């Protein structure tokens, strides 16, 4: 079976890879950071701005779009690309992470997850089949398995049956997938911070490999120590199929991103850059900058003196601080624009470094300055 999403490695430097993912809506150069458009919009950003900052792919959220405005409505309106006027690739998550984050509002059963809406308390049920059906309706280029997401520091006793359920659910997702010719399905490797359990999860999913266009690493950056995340990435990523893209879910901190790339990760996403931006925190080459701070009240410098984004070319720290302090929408837009640009550019620079066989030096130099060491 020819898969609708393919990957080609162009260059390697150690384990780090520069490549190209091909989808029906275009190509994606990797490594890549993917802005998150939870409710069919990347918060505060227009399509034109997303293209301007170099976005090649964005995320949509299955859980949120199922609740509002509803996946069937989006399908009737021509699918998610048409609905949000975005003609480049889209990845949809399965809704699993959001449903499992509901805590007491959800009940896990073998058939799926029963939950109450965080909006109005209405009762809902998402199964592996339902998750795939929603994603088929949305019409994204990359769809994700519906997996069980164990909490950050879960015990082995909790994780073993959880992995086995994820494998059973994976089989059901594969069978339910109605658009295998146009939507690439990604597997999700779980296993917490235990190397042997990560291996178990990957081994079980690999038995269905011909159905998967890529492999995601789930269940990291959920509260475990950083060292554990790096150790697991270092162990499991290179064991994923070489000829398919590898996606680290939910990571958007610059240092973590570069360490992930070093382990062989190709794709990452996170709400962090826009969430931090809305609270007045921005990324710079010298680390995070809290723009609300009094010290920037009369600062005429740009957010990052070495950044060539539209915001840094046109606005001062003092002005952006003022906007954030008085809660003007433009402030949120400018900080969001800059943060997303920063992470997308970081991955483009990492790609160049890999192609020029200087990634390790690039990474160490960036981290040393970013962490002020």
From Swiss-Prot:
- Annotated Zn(2+) binding lies at 307, 309, 312, 338
This protein's pathway reads:
tRNA modification; tRNA-queuosine biosynthesis
List all disulphide bridges recorded for this chain: none
Q: Does the keyword Cytoplasm apply?
A: no
InterPro entries linked: ArchSynthase1/Queuine_TRR (IPR050076), TGT (IPR004803), TGT-like_sf (IPR036511), tRNA_ribo_trans-like (IPR002616)
**Active site: which residues?**
93 (proton acceptor), 269 (nucleophile)
SUPFAM superfamilies (UniProt xref): tRNA-guanine transglycosylase (SSF51713)
Tell whether Coiled coil is among the UniProt keywords: no
The catalytic activity, as recorded, is: 7-aminomethyl-7-carbaguanine + guanosine(34) in tRNA = 7-aminomethyl-7-carbaguanosine(34) in tRNA + guanine
What is the free-text note on the cofactor?
Binds 1 zinc ion per subunit.
One of the record's GO cellular component terms: cytoplasm
> Under which EC number(s) is this enzyme classified?
2.4.2.29
The GO biological-process annotations, alphabetized, read as: queuosine biosynthetic process; tRNA wobble guanine modification; tRNA-guanine transglycosylation
Q: Which residues bind substrate?
A: 93-97, 147, 190, 219
Coiled-coil segments:
none
**What are the UniProt keywords, alphabetically?**
Glycosyltransferase, Metal-binding, Queuosine biosynthesis, Transferase, tRNA processing, Zinc
Molecular-function annotations in GO? metal ion binding; tRNA-guanosine(34) queuine transglycosylase activity
Residues covered by region (RNA binding):
250-256, 274-278
Cofactor dependence: Zn(2+)
Binding partners and assembly: Homodimer. Within each dimer, one monomer is responsible for RNA recognition and catalysis, while the other monomer binds to the replacement base PreQ1.
The record's comment on protein family reads: Belongs to the queuine tRNA-ribosyltransferase family.
What is the role of this chain? Catalyzes the base-exchange of a guanine (G) residue with the queuine precursor 7-aminomethyl-7-deazaguanine (PreQ1) at position 34 (anticodon wobble position) in tRNAs with GU(N) anticodons (tRNA-Asp, -Asn, -His and -Tyr). Catalysis occurs through a double-displacement mechanism. The nucleophile active site attacks the C1' of nucleotide 34 to detach the guanine base from the RNA, forming a covalent enzyme-RNA intermediate. The proton acceptor active site deprotonates the incoming PreQ1, allowing a nucleophilic attack on the C1' of the ribose to form the product.
The protein depicted here goes by the name Queuine tRNA-ribosyltransferase
What gene name is listed for this protein? tgt
């Amino acid at each position: 079976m020819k898969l609708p999403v393919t990957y080609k490695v162009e260059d390697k430097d150690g384990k780090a890879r520069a490549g190209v993912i091909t989808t029906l809506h275009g190509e994606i150069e990797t490594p890549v950071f993917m802005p998150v458009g939870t409710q069919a919009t990347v918060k505060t950003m227009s399509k034109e701005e997303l293209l301007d900052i170099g976005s090649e792919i964005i995320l949509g959220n299955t859980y949120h779009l199922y609740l509002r405005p509803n996946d069937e409505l989006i399908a009737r309106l021509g699918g998610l690309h048409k609905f949000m006027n975005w003609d480049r690739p889209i990845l949809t998550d399965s809704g699993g992470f959001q449903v499992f984050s509901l805590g007491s509002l959800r009940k896990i059963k073998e058939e799926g997850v029963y939950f109450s809406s965080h909006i109005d308390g209405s009762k809902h049920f998402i199964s592996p089949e339902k998750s795939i059906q929603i994603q088929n309706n949305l019409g994204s280029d990359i769809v994700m398995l519906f997996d069980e997401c164990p909490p950050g520091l879960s015990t082995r006793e909790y994780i073993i049956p959880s992995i086995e359920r994820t494998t059973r659910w994976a089989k059901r997702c594969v069978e339910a997938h109605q658009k295998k010719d146009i939507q690439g399905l990604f597997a999700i490797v779980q296993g917490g911070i235990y190397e042997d359990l990560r291996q178990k999860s990957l081994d079980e999913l690999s038995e269905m490999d011909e159905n998967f266009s890529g492999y995601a690493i789930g269940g990291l950056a959920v509260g475990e120590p950083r060292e554990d995340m790096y150790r697991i990435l270092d162990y499991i990523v290179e064991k994923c199929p070489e000829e398919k893209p590898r996606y680290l879910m939910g990571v958007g901190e610059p240092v973590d991103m570069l360490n992930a790339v070093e382990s062989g990760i190709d794709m990452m996403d996170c709400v962090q850059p826009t969430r931090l931006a809305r609270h007045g925190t921005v990324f710079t080459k010298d680390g995070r900058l809290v723009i609300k701070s009094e010290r920037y009240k009369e600062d005429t410098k740009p957010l990052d003196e070495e950044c060539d984004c539209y915001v840094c070319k046109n606005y001062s720290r003092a002005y952006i601080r003022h906007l954030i302090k008085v809660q003007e929408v433009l402030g949120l837009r400018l900080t969001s624009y800059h943060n997303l640009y920063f992470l997308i550019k970081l991955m483009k620079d990492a790609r160049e470094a890999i192609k020029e066989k200087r990634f390790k030096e690039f990474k160490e130099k960036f981290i040393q300055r970013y962490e002020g060491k």
